[in-house]
Curated annotation (Swiss-Prot):
The modification N6-(pyridoxal phosphate)lysine is found at residue 229. This is Serine hydroxymethyltransferase. It is found in: Cytoplasm. It comes from Buchnera aphidicola subsp. Acyrthosiphon pisum (strain 5A). Catalyzes the reversible interconversion of serine and glycine with tetrahydrofolate (THF) serving as the one-carbon carrier. This reaction serves as the major source of one-carbon groups required for the biosynthesis of purines, thymidylate, methionine, and other important biomolecules. Also exhibits THF-independent aldolase activity toward beta-hydroxyamino acids, producing glycine and aldehydes, via a retro-aldol mechanism. CDD domains: SHMT (cd00378). Its cofactor is pyridoxal 5'-phosphate. Keywords: Amino-acid biosynthesis, Cytoplasm, One-carbon metabolism, Pyridoxal phosphate, Transferase. The record marks 228 as: Plays an important role in substrate specificity. Its main location: cytoplasm. One of its GO terms (cellular component) is cytosol.
Length: 417
Protein backbone atom coordinates (compact mmCIF):
# COMPACT_ATOMS: atom_id res chain seq x y z
CA UNK A 1 0.00 0.00 0.00
CA UNK A 2 1.47 3.32 -1.08
CA UNK A 3 1.03 5.44 2.01
CA UNK A 4 4.00 7.74 2.52
CA UNK A 5 4.28 8.08 6.28
CA UNK A 6 7.45 10.15 6.21
CA UNK A 7 6.99 13.84 5.47
CA UNK A 8 8.48 14.83 2.08
CA UNK A 9 10.70 17.46 3.67
CA UNK A 10 12.28 14.77 5.85
CA UNK A 11 12.36 12.03 3.22
CA UNK A 12 14.23 14.09 0.61
CA UNK A 13 15.34 17.34 2.27
CA UNK A 14 17.65 18.43 -0.58
CA UNK A 15 14.91 18.17 -3.21
CA UNK A 16 12.32 19.68 -0.89
CA UNK A 17 14.61 22.62 -0.14
CA UNK A 18 15.20 23.34 -3.84
CA UNK A 19 11.46 23.26 -4.58
CA UNK A 20 10.66 25.52 -1.64
CA UNK A 21 13.32 27.99 -2.72
CA UNK A 22 11.89 28.05 -6.24
CA UNK A 23 8.44 28.75 -4.78
CA UNK A 24 9.88 31.69 -2.88
CA UNK A 25 11.75 32.91 -5.96
CA UNK A 26 8.55 32.95 -8.00
CA UNK A 27 6.71 34.86 -5.28
CA UNK A 28 9.50 37.36 -4.61
CA UNK A 29 10.71 38.10 -8.14
CA UNK A 30 9.08 40.15 -10.88
CA UNK A 31 8.92 37.75 -13.81
CA UNK A 32 9.41 39.46 -17.17
CA UNK A 33 10.58 36.50 -19.26
CA UNK A 34 8.14 36.47 -22.18
CA UNK A 35 7.88 32.69 -22.41
CA UNK A 36 6.98 32.18 -18.75
CA UNK A 37 3.68 32.33 -16.92
CA UNK A 38 1.89 30.99 -13.85
CA UNK A 39 -0.55 28.11 -14.15
CA UNK A 40 -3.68 27.78 -12.06
CA UNK A 41 -3.87 25.47 -9.06
CA UNK A 42 -6.22 23.28 -11.09
CA UNK A 43 -3.52 22.74 -13.70
CA UNK A 44 -0.93 21.88 -11.08
CA UNK A 45 -3.29 19.58 -9.17
CA UNK A 46 -4.15 17.60 -12.29
CA UNK A 47 -0.50 17.17 -13.20
CA UNK A 48 0.11 15.62 -9.79
CA UNK A 49 -2.79 13.18 -10.10
CA UNK A 50 -2.89 9.40 -10.64
CA UNK A 51 -3.04 10.05 -14.38
CA UNK A 52 0.75 10.12 -14.34
CA UNK A 53 0.61 6.33 -13.84
CA UNK A 54 -1.33 5.54 -17.02
CA UNK A 55 0.26 4.49 -20.30
CA UNK A 56 -1.94 5.17 -23.33
CA UNK A 57 -0.09 4.71 -26.63
CA UNK A 58 -2.33 5.51 -29.56
CA UNK A 59 -5.40 7.73 -29.76
CA UNK A 60 -8.86 7.67 -28.13
CA UNK A 61 -10.66 4.49 -29.15
CA UNK A 62 -7.49 3.12 -30.78
CA UNK A 63 -5.08 2.40 -27.94
CA UNK A 64 -2.39 -0.25 -27.72
CA UNK A 65 -3.11 -0.82 -24.03
CA UNK A 66 -6.20 -1.73 -22.04
CA UNK A 67 -7.74 0.29 -19.26
CA UNK A 68 -7.90 3.50 -21.29
CA UNK A 69 -11.63 4.19 -21.09
CA UNK A 70 -11.19 7.15 -18.74
CA UNK A 71 -8.08 8.66 -20.28
CA UNK A 72 -9.94 8.49 -23.60
CA UNK A 73 -12.59 10.77 -22.11
CA UNK A 74 -9.88 13.14 -20.88
CA UNK A 75 -8.06 13.35 -24.21
CA UNK A 76 -11.32 13.83 -26.13
CA UNK A 77 -12.22 16.68 -23.76
CA UNK A 78 -8.88 18.34 -24.42
CA UNK A 79 -9.26 17.90 -28.19
CA UNK A 80 -12.79 19.31 -28.34
CA UNK A 81 -11.92 22.27 -26.13
CA UNK A 82 -8.82 23.08 -28.19
CA UNK A 83 -10.87 22.98 -31.39
CA UNK A 84 -13.52 25.25 -29.91
CA UNK A 85 -10.96 27.67 -28.48
CA UNK A 86 -9.14 28.17 -31.77
CA UNK A 87 -11.98 27.50 -34.25
CA UNK A 88 -10.19 24.43 -35.61
CA UNK A 89 -11.40 21.23 -37.27
CA UNK A 90 -8.47 19.17 -36.03
CA UNK A 91 -6.42 19.13 -32.84
CA UNK A 92 -3.66 16.89 -31.56
CA UNK A 93 -2.97 17.45 -27.86
CA UNK A 94 -0.26 14.82 -27.45
CA UNK A 95 2.98 16.71 -28.30
CA UNK A 96 5.16 16.99 -25.20
CA UNK A 97 6.38 20.46 -26.23
CA UNK A 98 6.20 23.09 -28.92
CA UNK A 99 9.41 21.78 -30.44
CA UNK A 100 7.93 18.27 -30.55
CA UNK A 101 4.84 19.69 -32.24
CA UNK A 102 6.98 21.41 -34.86
CA UNK A 103 9.11 18.31 -35.39
CA UNK A 104 5.96 16.24 -35.93
CA UNK A 105 4.50 18.68 -38.45
CA UNK A 106 7.75 19.00 -40.40
CA UNK A 107 8.25 15.25 -40.64
CA UNK A 108 4.62 14.80 -41.68
CA UNK A 109 4.85 17.30 -44.54
CA UNK A 110 8.50 17.28 -45.60
CA UNK A 111 11.27 14.97 -46.70
CA UNK A 112 14.84 15.38 -45.42
CA UNK A 113 16.64 17.93 -47.57
CA UNK A 114 13.52 19.86 -48.54
CA UNK A 115 13.80 23.64 -48.50
CA UNK A 116 12.09 25.56 -45.71
CA UNK A 117 11.79 29.31 -45.21
CA UNK A 118 11.68 30.59 -41.62
CA UNK A 119 12.44 33.72 -39.66
CA UNK A 120 16.06 34.23 -38.60
CA UNK A 121 16.60 33.45 -34.94
CA UNK A 122 18.45 36.74 -34.46
CA UNK A 123 15.51 38.62 -35.99
CA UNK A 124 12.93 37.07 -33.68
CA UNK A 125 12.41 33.53 -34.97
CA UNK A 126 12.78 30.29 -33.02
CA UNK A 127 15.35 27.50 -32.93
CA UNK A 128 12.91 25.18 -34.68
CA UNK A 129 12.44 27.59 -37.57
CA UNK A 130 15.75 26.63 -39.13
CA UNK A 131 18.57 27.26 -36.67
CA UNK A 132 21.72 25.37 -37.62
CA UNK A 133 22.04 23.89 -34.13
CA UNK A 134 18.49 22.52 -34.20
CA UNK A 135 16.98 19.50 -35.97
CA UNK A 136 15.26 21.90 -38.38
CA UNK A 137 18.60 23.25 -39.54
CA UNK A 138 20.19 19.82 -39.74
CA UNK A 139 17.40 17.96 -41.56
CA UNK A 140 16.32 20.61 -44.07
CA UNK A 141 17.77 23.15 -46.46
CA UNK A 142 17.09 26.41 -44.64
CA UNK A 143 16.54 29.84 -46.16
CA UNK A 144 15.84 32.64 -43.69
CA UNK A 145 13.83 35.85 -43.89
CA UNK A 146 13.99 38.68 -41.39
CA UNK A 147 12.77 42.11 -40.43
CA UNK A 148 13.43 45.41 -42.20
CA UNK A 149 15.17 48.49 -40.81
CA UNK A 150 11.96 49.38 -38.95
CA UNK A 151 11.84 46.04 -37.18
CA UNK A 152 8.83 44.81 -39.18
CA UNK A 153 8.65 41.53 -41.09
CA UNK A 154 10.07 42.15 -44.56
CA UNK A 155 7.32 40.71 -46.76
CA UNK A 156 9.06 41.86 -49.94
CA UNK A 157 12.11 39.84 -48.96
CA UNK A 158 9.88 36.90 -48.08
CA UNK A 159 8.26 37.03 -51.52
CA UNK A 160 11.60 37.38 -53.28
CA UNK A 161 13.11 34.43 -51.42
CA UNK A 162 10.01 32.35 -52.07
CA UNK A 163 10.17 32.98 -55.81
CA UNK A 164 13.90 32.29 -55.90
CA UNK A 165 14.15 29.16 -53.74
CA UNK A 166 10.63 27.70 -54.06
CA UNK A 167 10.48 26.30 -50.52
CA UNK A 168 8.34 23.30 -49.64
CA UNK A 169 7.28 25.06 -46.44
CA UNK A 170 7.11 28.62 -45.09
CA UNK A 171 7.09 29.00 -41.32
CA UNK A 172 5.33 31.93 -39.69
CA UNK A 173 5.55 32.84 -36.02
CA UNK A 174 8.24 34.03 -33.66
CA UNK A 175 9.82 34.06 -30.22
CA UNK A 176 10.80 37.74 -30.13
CA UNK A 177 8.69 39.90 -32.45
CA UNK A 178 6.37 42.60 -31.15
CA UNK A 179 4.41 43.27 -34.33
CA UNK A 180 1.32 41.70 -35.88
CA UNK A 181 1.94 39.04 -38.48
CA UNK A 182 -0.06 39.32 -41.68
CA UNK A 183 -1.07 35.67 -41.99
CA UNK A 184 -3.14 36.34 -45.10
CA UNK A 185 -0.19 37.89 -46.94
CA UNK A 186 2.12 35.08 -45.84
CA UNK A 187 -0.31 32.45 -47.13
CA UNK A 188 -0.56 34.36 -50.42
CA UNK A 189 3.23 34.23 -50.70
CA UNK A 190 3.33 30.53 -49.80
CA UNK A 191 0.80 29.79 -52.52
CA UNK A 192 3.15 31.37 -55.07
CA UNK A 193 5.45 28.39 -54.56
CA UNK A 194 2.69 25.88 -53.79
CA UNK A 195 4.32 25.62 -50.36
CA UNK A 196 2.86 24.56 -47.06
CA UNK A 197 2.26 27.48 -44.72
CA UNK A 198 2.81 26.48 -41.09
CA UNK A 199 2.33 28.94 -38.23
CA UNK A 200 3.98 28.54 -34.85
CA UNK A 201 1.81 30.72 -32.61
CA UNK A 202 3.36 29.52 -29.34
CA UNK A 203 3.96 33.01 -27.98
CA UNK A 204 0.59 34.52 -28.82
CA UNK A 205 -1.78 31.56 -28.41
CA UNK A 206 -3.50 33.16 -25.43
CA UNK A 207 -3.99 36.42 -27.33
CA UNK A 208 -5.33 34.48 -30.32
CA UNK A 209 -7.74 32.53 -28.11
CA UNK A 210 -9.05 35.81 -26.70
CA UNK A 211 -9.51 37.34 -30.15
CA UNK A 212 -6.90 40.04 -29.52
CA UNK A 213 -4.29 38.80 -32.00
CA UNK A 214 -5.17 37.52 -35.52
CA UNK A 215 -5.98 33.82 -35.62
CA UNK A 216 -3.86 32.04 -38.26
CA UNK A 217 -6.17 29.02 -38.44
CA UNK A 218 -7.98 30.18 -41.61
CA UNK A 219 -4.73 30.82 -43.49
CA UNK A 220 -2.22 28.21 -42.35
CA UNK A 221 -2.27 24.61 -43.49
CA UNK A 222 -1.20 23.70 -39.96
CA UNK A 223 -0.82 25.67 -36.72
CA UNK A 224 1.40 24.67 -33.80
CA UNK A 225 1.66 26.06 -30.31
CA UNK A 226 2.81 25.55 -26.79
CA UNK A 227 0.19 25.44 -24.05
CA UNK A 228 2.03 27.59 -21.52
CA UNK A 229 3.29 31.13 -22.26
CA UNK A 230 0.28 33.45 -22.81
CA UNK A 231 -2.11 30.48 -22.73
CA UNK A 232 -1.08 29.93 -19.08
CA UNK A 233 -1.49 26.16 -19.15
CA UNK A 234 0.96 23.33 -18.52
CA UNK A 235 4.22 23.00 -20.38
CA UNK A 236 3.27 21.13 -23.54
CA UNK A 237 2.57 21.28 -27.26
CA UNK A 238 -0.45 21.44 -29.57
CA UNK A 239 -1.16 20.97 -33.28
CA UNK A 240 -4.23 22.48 -34.98
CA UNK A 241 -5.66 22.61 -38.48
CA UNK A 242 -8.78 23.68 -40.35
CA UNK A 243 -10.16 23.03 -43.82
CA UNK A 244 -7.75 20.14 -44.28
CA UNK A 245 -8.64 16.60 -45.21
CA UNK A 246 -8.46 13.21 -43.53
CA UNK A 247 -5.21 12.42 -45.34
CA UNK A 248 -3.49 15.47 -43.79
CA UNK A 249 -4.91 14.79 -40.34
CA UNK A 250 -3.86 11.15 -40.47
CA UNK A 251 -0.33 12.18 -41.51
CA UNK A 252 -0.12 14.55 -38.57
CA UNK A 253 -1.38 11.97 -36.09
CA UNK A 254 1.03 9.31 -37.32
CA UNK A 255 3.89 11.78 -37.21
CA UNK A 256 3.23 12.49 -33.53
CA UNK A 257 2.64 8.83 -32.65
CA UNK A 258 4.44 6.61 -33.44
CA UNK A 259 6.67 8.97 -35.43
CA UNK A 260 8.02 11.31 -32.75
CA UNK A 261 6.71 10.02 -29.45
CA UNK A 262 5.59 6.92 -27.61
CA UNK A 263 3.02 7.16 -24.85
CA UNK A 264 1.33 10.52 -24.28
CA UNK A 265 1.58 12.25 -20.90
CA UNK A 266 -2.03 11.87 -19.77
CA UNK A 267 -1.57 13.99 -16.64
CA UNK A 268 -0.36 16.85 -18.86
CA UNK A 269 -3.14 16.33 -21.40
CA UNK A 270 -5.66 16.59 -18.55
CA UNK A 271 -3.96 19.81 -17.49
CA UNK A 272 -4.27 21.08 -21.07
CA UNK A 273 -8.00 20.31 -20.93
CA UNK A 274 -8.34 22.41 -17.76
CA UNK A 275 -6.30 25.25 -19.28
CA UNK A 276 -8.47 25.27 -22.42
CA UNK A 277 -11.59 25.46 -20.25
CA UNK A 278 -10.10 28.40 -18.36
CA UNK A 279 -9.23 30.11 -21.64
CA UNK A 280 -12.84 29.82 -22.80
CA UNK A 281 -14.06 31.91 -19.85
CA UNK A 282 -14.78 35.66 -20.25
CA UNK A 283 -12.23 36.67 -17.61
CA UNK A 284 -9.47 35.13 -19.71
CA UNK A 285 -10.15 37.71 -22.42
CA UNK A 286 -9.94 40.47 -19.82
CA UNK A 287 -6.59 39.08 -18.71
CA UNK A 288 -5.23 38.97 -22.27
CA UNK A 289 -6.33 42.55 -22.94
CA UNK A 290 -4.49 43.68 -19.83
CA UNK A 291 -1.34 41.85 -20.98
CA UNK A 292 -1.23 44.01 -24.11
CA UNK A 293 -2.11 47.20 -22.21
CA UNK A 294 0.76 46.56 -19.81
CA UNK A 295 3.14 45.80 -22.64
CA UNK A 296 2.26 49.04 -24.42
CA UNK A 297 2.66 51.09 -21.23
CA UNK A 298 6.12 49.66 -20.65
CA UNK A 299 7.19 50.42 -24.22
CA UNK A 300 6.00 54.01 -23.90
CA UNK A 301 7.82 54.41 -20.61
CA UNK A 302 11.10 53.03 -21.97
CA UNK A 303 10.87 55.30 -25.00
CA UNK A 304 10.32 58.30 -22.73
CA UNK A 305 13.48 57.33 -20.85
CA UNK A 306 15.54 57.30 -24.05
CA UNK A 307 15.64 53.55 -24.65
CA UNK A 308 15.39 52.09 -28.13
CA UNK A 309 12.63 49.55 -28.72
CA UNK A 310 12.92 47.31 -31.77
CA UNK A 311 10.11 48.45 -34.13
CA UNK A 312 9.26 51.21 -31.65
CA UNK A 313 6.03 49.59 -30.49
CA UNK A 314 4.32 46.40 -29.39
CA UNK A 315 1.01 44.79 -30.28
CA UNK A 316 1.38 41.71 -28.12
CA UNK A 317 2.88 40.59 -24.81
CA UNK A 318 6.55 41.24 -25.54
CA UNK A 319 9.12 43.68 -26.86
CA UNK A 320 12.87 43.92 -27.38
CA UNK A 321 15.07 46.63 -25.91
CA UNK A 322 18.18 47.53 -27.90
CA UNK A 323 20.87 48.37 -25.35
CA UNK A 324 23.57 49.28 -27.87
CA UNK A 325 23.47 52.99 -27.05
CA UNK A 326 23.48 52.27 -23.31
CA UNK A 327 26.93 50.66 -23.37
CA UNK A 328 25.71 47.55 -21.58
CA UNK A 329 25.24 44.04 -22.94
CA UNK A 330 22.09 41.99 -22.62
CA UNK A 331 23.95 39.52 -20.43
CA UNK A 332 25.11 42.20 -18.01
CA UNK A 333 21.64 43.77 -17.91
CA UNK A 334 20.15 40.36 -17.10
CA UNK A 335 22.63 39.88 -14.25
CA UNK A 336 22.30 43.32 -12.66
CA UNK A 337 18.48 43.29 -12.83
CA UNK A 338 18.36 39.86 -11.20
CA UNK A 339 20.09 41.37 -8.16
CA UNK A 340 17.00 43.54 -7.71
CA UNK A 341 14.72 40.49 -8.12
CA UNK A 342 13.70 41.52 -11.64
CA UNK A 343 13.97 38.63 -14.09
CA UNK A 344 14.44 39.26 -17.83
CA UNK A 345 16.37 37.39 -20.50
CA UNK A 346 19.21 38.53 -22.69
CA UNK A 347 18.20 38.44 -26.34
CA UNK A 348 19.79 39.06 -29.71
CA UNK A 349 18.50 41.98 -31.74
CA UNK A 350 18.32 42.17 -35.56
CA UNK A 351 21.84 42.26 -37.04
CA UNK A 352 23.35 41.83 -33.59
CA UNK A 353 27.16 41.91 -33.60
CA UNK A 354 27.35 40.13 -30.26
CA UNK A 355 26.98 36.38 -29.69
CA UNK A 356 23.74 34.81 -28.39
CA UNK A 357 25.56 34.28 -25.10
CA UNK A 358 26.21 38.01 -24.70
CA UNK A 359 23.65 39.87 -26.91
CA UNK A 360 22.91 43.54 -27.38
CA UNK A 361 19.38 43.41 -26.07
CA UNK A 362 16.90 42.10 -23.54
CA UNK A 363 13.43 40.70 -24.10
CA UNK A 364 10.58 41.70 -21.83
CA UNK A 365 7.16 40.09 -21.55
CA UNK A 366 4.10 40.95 -19.48
CA UNK A 367 2.10 37.70 -19.35
CA UNK A 368 3.34 36.61 -15.91
CA UNK A 369 3.21 39.97 -14.13
CA UNK A 370 -0.29 40.58 -15.48
CA UNK A 371 -1.33 37.15 -14.25
CA UNK A 372 -0.44 38.13 -10.69
CA UNK A 373 -2.50 41.32 -10.93
CA UNK A 374 -0.12 44.04 -12.08
CA UNK A 375 -1.72 46.79 -14.14
CA UNK A 376 -0.54 49.99 -15.82
CA UNK A 377 0.59 51.68 -12.61
CA UNK A 378 2.71 48.73 -11.49
CA UNK A 379 4.40 48.05 -14.82
CA UNK A 380 5.15 51.75 -15.23
CA UNK A 381 7.00 51.64 -11.91
CA UNK A 382 8.84 48.50 -12.98
CA UNK A 383 9.97 50.23 -16.18
CA UNK A 384 11.32 53.12 -14.12
CA UNK A 385 13.15 50.73 -11.80
CA UNK A 386 14.75 48.94 -14.74
CA UNK A 387 15.95 52.16 -16.37
CA UNK A 388 17.21 53.46 -13.03
CA UNK A 389 19.32 50.33 -12.56
CA UNK A 390 20.61 50.21 -16.13
CA UNK A 391 21.49 53.90 -16.08
CA UNK A 392 23.49 53.41 -12.89
CA UNK A 393 24.88 49.88 -13.03
CA UNK A 394 27.61 50.62 -10.49
CA UNK A 395 25.22 52.04 -7.88
CA UNK A 396 24.74 48.97 -5.71
CA UNK A 397 22.81 50.88 -3.08
CA UNK A 398 20.27 51.86 -5.75
CA UNK A 399 19.86 48.18 -6.67
CA UNK A 400 19.21 47.29 -3.03
CA UNK A 401 16.67 50.10 -2.62
CA UNK A 402 14.80 48.98 -5.73
CA UNK A 403 14.90 45.36 -4.54
CA UNK A 404 13.04 46.46 -1.40
CA UNK A 405 10.37 48.10 -3.56
CA UNK A 406 10.14 44.95 -5.69
CA UNK A 407 9.59 42.81 -2.59
CA UNK A 408 6.88 45.18 -1.36
CA UNK A 409 5.07 44.99 -4.69
CA UNK A 410 5.36 41.21 -4.84
CA UNK A 411 4.00 40.90 -1.30
CA UNK A 412 1.02 43.05 -2.28
CA UNK A 413 0.32 40.87 -5.33
CA UNK A 414 1.09 37.23 -4.43
CA UNK A 415 1.08 34.66 -7.23
CA UNK A 416 -0.57 31.94 -5.16
CA UNK A 417 -2.62 32.99 -2.14
Amino acid sequence: MLNNKIDFSKYDPKLWFAIEQEKKRQENHIELIASENYTSNYVMDVQGSQLTNKYAEGYPGKRYYGGCEYVDIIEELAIERAKKLFNADYANVQPHSGSQANFSVYTALLNPGDTILGMKLSHGGHLTHGSSVNFSGKMYNVISYGVDENGEINYEELLRLTKKYKPKMIIGGFSAYSGICNWKKMRFIADKADAYFVVDMAHVAGLVAAGIYPNPINYAHVVTSTTHKTLAGPRGGLILAKNGDDILYKKLNLSVFPGAQGGPLMHVIAAKAIAFKEALEPKFKTYQKQIVKNSKVMVERFLEKGYKIISGHTFNHLFLIDLTNKKITGKDADIILSKANITVNKNTIPNDLKSPFITSGIRIGTAAVTRRGFKENEVSKISDWITSILNNVDDHNNVLQIKKKVLEMCLKYPVYI
